[in-house]
């Protein structure tokens, strides 16, 4: 079994290449071509070329058609997402600005920290995750009593964040959200692929309304961690498997294999 990194919005995502005496099987895991690690996905395609079986995710075709345009809140790639977030911050001078993000997207938050015009402050837990994953220390606030082993010189008092309107760009996680009624009126919040993810989640509309009720502008800026429909076909064609097995999709039948056969597996089926 060969483990290979691929481009995804979760740090450390990998595909697998499984070689047996009888066949060569590639498993994509979750992957894409529009993130920070496009070359890794292309390398996975190269290594998996002409495999006997390709098991590939099909998340995007669950919800989108091949000719669908990007949603207004969706960016072409991660770099555009960072630029869009920074522009929101720059255009809201003297306003409190908070955000939340997908905790596994280490590379995104690192680039936000590096480029944002304000000092970025994370929750203690998220700061701990980044430190453990890649050894980078960040500014943080803490609302629980756990010992994460963080640098106390980087700790920002939560009351200071609640009163801030120009210095900080800080994470509003689930614990901090309990204090939403203490946030500044007329402030700004940026939701970047954090939970709840969207309208399909029954918690999403009440979540958005909570900000509206507290006079905080709600912004969505997102960039999917999954290959878009046409990119999925590009990946399949680059690999050119003898047998394609779509998985991780509500509509696996939307994928097709121009160079071989396709199998739509059923629950409990042994291939």
Report the location of each language-model feature:
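His/Asp/Glu-rich metal-coordinating catalytic cores
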Residues: 1-107, 111-114, 121
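Active-site metal-binding loops of divalent metal-dependent hydrolases
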Residues: 7-9, 29-31, 58-59, 102, ...
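Non-globular, low-confidence helical/coil segments that flank catalytic cores
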Residues: 2, 27, 35, 128, ...
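Hard-cation-handling environments
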Residues: 68-179, 183, 247
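C-terminal regulatory/interaction regions
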Residues: 114-118, 145-271
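Conserved beta-strand termini and adjacent loop/short-helix elements that scaffold enzyme active sites
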Residues: 4-6, 123, 141-143, 221, ...
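Flexible loop/turn segments at secondary-structure boundaries
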Residues: 10, 34, 62-65, 105-109, ...
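Short connector loops at secondary-structure junctions
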Residues: 58-65, 124-135, 139, 222-231
């Amino acid at each position: 079994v060969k483990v290979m990194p691929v481009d995804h919005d979760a740090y450390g995502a990998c595909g697998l290449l499984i070689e047996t005496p009888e066949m060569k099987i590639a498993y994509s895991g979750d992957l894409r071509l529009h993130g920070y690690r496009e070359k890794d996905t292309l390398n996975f395609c190269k290594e998996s070329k002409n495999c006997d079986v390709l098991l590939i995710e099909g998340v995007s075709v669950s919800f989108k058609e091949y000719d669908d345009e990007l949603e207004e809140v969706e960016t072409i790639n991660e770099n555009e997402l960072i630029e869009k977030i920074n522009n929101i911050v720059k255009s809201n001078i003297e306003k409190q600005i908070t955000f939340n993000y997908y905790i596994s997207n280490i590379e995104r938050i690192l680039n936000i920290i590096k480029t944002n015009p304000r000092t970025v402050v994370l929750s203690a837990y998220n700061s701990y995750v980044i430190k453990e994953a890649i050894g980078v220390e960040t500014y943080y606030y803490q609302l629980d009593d756990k010992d994460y082993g963080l640098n106390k010189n980087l700790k920002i008092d939560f009351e200071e964040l609640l009163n801030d309107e120009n210095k900080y760009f800080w994470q509003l996680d689930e614990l901090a959200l309990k204090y939403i009624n203490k946030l500044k009126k007329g402030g700004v919040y940026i939701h970047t692929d954090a939970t709840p993810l969207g309208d399909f989640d029954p918690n999403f509309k009440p979540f958005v309304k909570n900000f509206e009720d507290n006079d905080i502008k709600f912004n969505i800026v997102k960039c999917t961690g999954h290959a878009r429909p046409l990119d999925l076909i590009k990946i399949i064609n680059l690999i050119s498997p003898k047998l394609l097995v779509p998985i991780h999709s509500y509509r696996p039948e939307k994928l097709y294999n121009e160079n071989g056969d396709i199998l739509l597996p059923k629950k409990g089926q042994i291939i």
